[in-house]
Amino acid sequence: MNKKDIVILCCVALCSLSGVSAQQPLRLSLDECRKMALAHSEELQKSDNALRQAELDREIAKTAFLPKFDASAVGAYILPDMDMMGMELRMRGTYMAGVNLTQPIYTGGKITTGHRLARIGEETATEQLRMTRMDVLVEADNAYWTYIAVGRKVRMLESYHAQMDTLHRQTEAALAAGMATENDLLRIETKRSDISYQLQKVRNGADLCRMSLCRIVGADFDTAIVATDTIFVASQPVGLSAETAARPELHLLEKQIAAGKEQIRMARADMLPTVGLSVGYSYFGNLELKGMTDAGGGTMVPYSQKYRDGMGLAMLSVKIPIFHWGESRKKVRKARYELCNAELDLQKNTRLLNIEVQQAIRNVQDGYELIRTAEKGLRQADENLRVMRNRHAASMASLTDLLDAQSQWQQAESNLIEAQTQYKIYETEYLRATGKL
């Protein structure tokens, strides 16, 4: 084997290894699913950006307490020269530069109110981030447990299909021995075709659930996922709290009321005087004045004088609103109506949140009872199927009875899968409803 062949084989081996590595499934626990969903969620990133913006708004509002420092410079070249009472004012290359400091002294409380509003906005953004985080976790949990449930249904139908394959082989042998009829074999084949149809539908559903989970955790859509938290543990729910004080929605409504009160103060500030202080210094130069002057004895001689100098300025301004056709009072009344609406929203949604948490508690309790009922039904279906298999093998039960027992087992297994999955989803919904997620 020459060197070229060795290089080609090495390249093929490396490509094979990379292909195997790319096909490795993603093993995912519920905790890992949550972490990846939080890290990938665009909505959560947008809420986090909104919080950063609110923090900057608060920092911006702080600067309103501080003096503003500005600098300016102006240059001018004016033609022709200006005539001023027989003299010429020349401004060719005239310049002026200055600095100015402005400090608000009293603004009717607008600056303080604006700072409080900015702080409320920051707190609102924090609660909005919490609410978005909860929504992401609820979506991740639902997708995770649904994916597990559909996978279990696939395995259940595959087991059911294997049972029908075994029964089909047994019936073929019985038909050859004259102990079964063609109708028995046709009924089994029909049932097996129906199971194949159901299995295909569930497999398609499982693939869609996998792609949905890939979207949530930020994985490629062709990534195979192996869920590791497949053991369902359901303990009897006791001591479930109906407290809603930790709900971010409730906090958002409270912040809305607080903001409404500040808006009233802001509207009232328009009726109050404002006081400001301004201090500055300016320097100008290259300003020339030309004219004629009496040199004595009636002799007029030309003269010119250039000016360059600096000057300071201190100014205190007071603005008092006197008459604006009731504009400010109407703004105050409007802000009061908005505050009233915010208080009504709080009353309404507090009742709705209480109903929601009560429903969540009821769902958890009912979900646990459904699991117990489904487990009992599955035990009975298992025993019934075992008995019917033995009786059918001993020719003491008809094929119809055996097929019915298998259908009952399938339904009981499906009921248990759905009950366990729904219970896990109800647990997450309860945590969200109480603000503990």
Predicted regions, residues:
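Membrane-spanning beta-strand positions in outer-membrane beta-barrel proteins
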Residues: 43, 68-70, 110, 201, ...
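Small/polar, glycine/serine/threonine/aspartate-rich low-complexity segments that form flexible
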Residues: 23-25, 72-103, 230-234, 278-320
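Sec/SRP-type N-terminal targeting helices
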Residues: 45-49, 62-63, 105-133, 183, ...
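Periplasmic alpha-helical coiled-coil/stalk elements that build and connect Gram-negative outer-membrane
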Residues: 28, 135-248, 363, 367, ...
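Bacterial Sec-pathway N-terminal export signals of envelope proteins
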Residues: 22-68, 74, 221, 227-263, ...
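Bacterial Sec-dependent N-terminal signal peptides
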Residues: 1-31, 38-41, 423, 437
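Short segments within alpha-helical structural elements
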Residues: 194-219, 378-436
